[in-house]
Amino acid sequence: MSASRLISRDPYTGEAIADFAVNDARSIDAACHSARAAFAEWAMTPLAERRAIALRFAETVRARREEIATLIARETGKPMWEALTEADSVAAKVAISIRAQDERAGERSEPMADATARLAHRPHGVLAVIGPFNFPMHLANGHIVPALLAGNAVVFKPSEKTPACGQLMGELWRAAGLPDHVLTIVIGGGEAGEALVRHEALDGVLFTGGVQAGRAIHRALADAPHKILALELGGNAPLVVWDVADIEAAAHLIVQSAYVTAGQRCTCARRLILPEGARGDALLEALTMLMDRLVIGGPFQSPAPFMGPVIDAHAAAQVLAAQDRMTADGGRPLRLAAVREARSALLSPGLIELTDAPLRDEEIFGPLLQVRRAADFDAALALANATRFGLAAGLISDDEALYRRFWTSVRAGIVNWNRPTTGASSAAPFGGVGGSGNHRPSAYYAADYSAYPVAGLESPSPVYRLPIGLNP
């Protein structure tokens, strides 16, 4: 990316997809002020009309499903089958968000003796949405849909890795009839993001992405408590496997947890916690055998791959550097992550045992899973909680009593039992605790931060009865 141009590249081939002009501070200023002007009319647009536009957006997405998925696959490198599921999720978000708005941010009234108590919700104003590259349309859309339904105007900056998906998002909303400047797309990297976050016309920032960027946004808004801030910052998810009879099924769940989307989901398992001894050894043997059979390749190849490349060569280098650090710490490589094809960000999955190595609490955003052993379940729980993050956690076990202990003890916002750690429902809260962020972004509870509650006492006419005395 130059100071004025941004080239989107295919992570698998390295080929250029599109070339974009980068928004500078002046154009971002214009976008924010245009959004502020558009907000006034959009907020007064009847809710039924705002919902009708959102429903047309969902219809447009369904009608252009293949086109959308193809662009997602090209720009992220994820397999076409997975890109299709993302396109479907973009459309499905509308109905979910409408229901969430009714249930969590609708209007309520309660009769009183001489008035009516009313609860309603108002939009904040102009919200910035800053999206990630791993689900460039689905996760950003999880902020955009509830924000627009609530009556906000939105300035959306997609990841600099996936600008074409961001531009397509704007095109789809325009095709649905969204008025001009209610949703504005700005393109750029860190400088554009900083100019957007610090803009005086904003009423809040909704961010999904890395920890460092999220903390920088938090600091930038530290003296602006009037601005809403929703952060989803990733995780270092533990997956505990304990007292399970079907080892092969457990291995499949581990692979789904750690390596889907080339390990580039914030809910991916980063730490596999196994029992010491023969049971743990058997699990690792089944896991490595399954890893050796995984199909890895380009997004459009046949047969379809399980996983494609990471987002770019820099991301691949970061994964390999983390693997080198783990090995230097005394880790025992069971399968080494390695670049599979020249000029590509395609990595094979890595697995490294670190039971006797120091704990490093970091999110490795790629297909690299570390293994640690525990003497008993209490020790496994302690290892699971040995992180400042708290997004997702999982237990694979036949013992429901162990799961109840896990559920009440593990510190995470998403806790799964005998399902991949990456499994989540858009109809349920999504988000974590600790270093994983605040609020519950991109899902059902996004309605909570898209509008603020307003309480009032209402009477159709003045009440003239005067008190005969005053309270002492």
Swiss-Prot record:
Residues engaged in binding NAD(+): 209-214
Residue positions of the active site: 232, 266
Pfam families named among the record's database cross-references: Aldedh (PF00171)
Gene Ontology terms for molecular function: succinylglutamate-semialdehyde dehydrogenase activity
UniProt catalytic activity: N-succinyl-L-glutamate 5-semialdehyde + NAD(+) + H2O = N-succinyl-L-glutamate + NADH + 2 H(+)
InterPro entries: Ald_DH/histidinol_DH, Ald_DH_C, Ald_DH_CS_CYS, Ald_DH_CS_GLU, Ald_DH_N, Aldehyde_DH_dom, SuccinylGlu_semiald_DH_AstD
Lineage: superkingdom: Bacteria
Key words of the record: Arginine metabolism, NAD, Oxidoreductase
Protein's GO biological process: arginine catabolic process to glutamate; arginine catabolic process to succinate
Keyword tRNA-binding on entry: no
Enzyme Commission no: 1.2.1.71
Pathway: Amino-acid degradation; L-arginine degradation via AST pathway; L-glutamate and succinate from L-arginine: step 4/5
Similarity comment: Belongs to the aldehyde dehydrogenase family. AstD subfamily.
HAMAP family documented for this protein: Aldedh_AstD
Function: Catalyzes the NAD-dependent reduction of succinylglutamate semialdehyde into succinylglutamate.
Protein name, as recorded: N-succinylglutamate 5-semialdehyde dehydrogenase 1
Organism encoding this protein: Caulobacter vibrioides (strain ATCC 19089 / CIP 103742 / CB 15) (Caulobacter crescentus)
GN (gene name): astD1
